[in-house]
């Protein structure tokens, strides 16, 4: 049985602020999106609050219109802003109770060839159980599975769509949720979301740690914990690190709870957004954890001899993981990485890629897909 993880970076539509050449390009809009929505929730708007709102709106092209290049001001009811023909705009709402609305990220269609190349990666990996990161929603993933994966020809063989498709909406409103696809005979028999898990500092997961129980033909349950940890893309590095550490601690607790219950067929996988030696991932990779990284398995093969999974796949780009409980790690017969859907460097010369990837915009993703073959 083959298990895989792939950050698809959306299939059909993606937030424009996330779709630039690099993180820095969309960072101001992403930060404004978060800060404005936080300010909007205040019961009373102080003069300083209003000044900050106006400053952020102007910086993002929203002082004269509800439509900016990357953001949209969505107003449902009540009065929020006055935009006179002469003179500066003015925030007329005195607090949250005066109006209903928010800032949303504008989306754009993903390059059609890139969408097809995403399906080529999935067909090439040909996993029995596939964890996906950054899926828009279940409907989109289902349609992608049926209409794109199911129509893909890879190595002259028609790719087969998955029988079971599931996404649970997480805490991120940018359409970058985690999900699972599985083949016929591998039903998803239970789902547990952790979107509401909290500690003393608040909600833990930026998206979710979605737990899927997959029933194997033998009757054995395989527990698959799909994750997408806090990114390094924007915000203070110290705060981001602290958030990922909290997330890793909670995933470790969930994993240990399964082991304590005698459920020792557990997979933790996804985009953890940090490298192995850094403190945020210590609860999963150190600190007495029994989880094992498939990249450390003697049967793991990487023909490109590059340590990373993201960007140019240097050591600082090892962000994606398949972590296995000891029982499962002992059943690994093969493991590897699929980079042919990535571009690779400025000129796309760092590794071989599909013929259909002729430029960076046609890449399936900035992430490689990881896979592990297990004798189950």
Place the predicted regions along the sequence by residue:
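Active-site His/acidic residue clusters
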Residues: 217-220, 225-241
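N-terminal, active-site-proximal structural segment of metallo-dependent hydrolase catalytic domains
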Residues: 1-159, 167-170, 355, 362
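Sec-exported extracytoplasmic/periplasmic mature domains
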Residues: 123-127, 140-150, 186, 253-260, ...
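Structured beta-strand-rich core segments of catalytic domains in phosphoester-bond hydrolases
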Residues: 110, 129-131, 135-223
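Metal-dependent phosphoester-hydrolase catalytic domains
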Residues: 2-4, 15, 192-205, 213, ...
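Stable alpha-helical elements in mature extracytoplasmic
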Residues: 114, 118, 137-140, 244-247, ...
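Active-site metal-binding loops of divalent metal-dependent hydrolases
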Residues: 8, 135, 229, 271-272, ...
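Active-site environment of divalent metal-dependent phosphoester hydrolases
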Residues: 137-139, 172-177, 232-234, 273-279, ...
């Amino acid at each position: 049985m083959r298990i895989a993880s792939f950050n698809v970076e959306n299939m059909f539509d993606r937030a424009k602020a996330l779709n630039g050449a690099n993180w820095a390009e969309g960072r101001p809009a992403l930060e404004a999106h978060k800060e404005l929505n936080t300010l909007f929730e205040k019961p009373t708007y102080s003069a300083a609050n209003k000044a900050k709102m106006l400053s952020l709106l102007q910086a993002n092209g929203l002082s004269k219109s509800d439509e900016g290049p990357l953001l949209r001001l969505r107003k449902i009811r009540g009065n929020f802003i006055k935009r006179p023909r002469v003179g500066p705009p003015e925030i007329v709402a005195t607090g949250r109770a005066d109006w209903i609305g928010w800032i949303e990220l504008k989306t754009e269609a993903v390059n059609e060839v890139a969408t097809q190349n995403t399906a080529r990666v999935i067909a090439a990996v040909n996993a029995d159980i596939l964890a996906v990161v950054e899926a828009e929603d279940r409907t989109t993933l289902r349609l992608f599975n049926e209409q794109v994966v199911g129509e893909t020809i890879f190595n002259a063989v028609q790719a087969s769509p998955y029988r079971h498709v599931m996404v649970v909406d997480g805490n991120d409103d940018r359409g970058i949720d985690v999900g699972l696809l599985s083949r016929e005979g591998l039903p998803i028999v239970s789902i547990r979301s952790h979107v509401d898990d909290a500690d003393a500092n608040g909600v833990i997961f930026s998206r979710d740690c979605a737990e899927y129980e997959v029933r194997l033909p033998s009757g054995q349950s395989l527990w698959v914990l799909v994750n997408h940890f806090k990114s390094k893309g924007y915000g203070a590095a110290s705060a981001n690190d602290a958030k990922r550490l909290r997330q890793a601690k909670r995933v470790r607790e969930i994993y240990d709870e399964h082991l304590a219950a005698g459920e020792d067929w557990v997979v933790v996988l996804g985009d953890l957004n940090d490298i192995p030696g850094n403190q945020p991932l210590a609860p999963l990779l150190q600190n007495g954890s029994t989880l094992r990284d498939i990249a450390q398995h003697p049967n793991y093969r990487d023909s490109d001899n590059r340590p990373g999974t993201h960007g140019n796949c240097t050591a600082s780009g090892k962000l994606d993981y398949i972590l296995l409980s000891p029982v499962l790690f002992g059943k690994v017969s093969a493991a590897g990485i699929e980079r042919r859907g990535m571009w690779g460097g400025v000129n796309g010369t760092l590794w071989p890629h599909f013929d259909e990837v002729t430029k960076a915009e046609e890449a399936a993703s900035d992430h490689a897909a990881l896979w592990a073959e297990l004798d189950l």
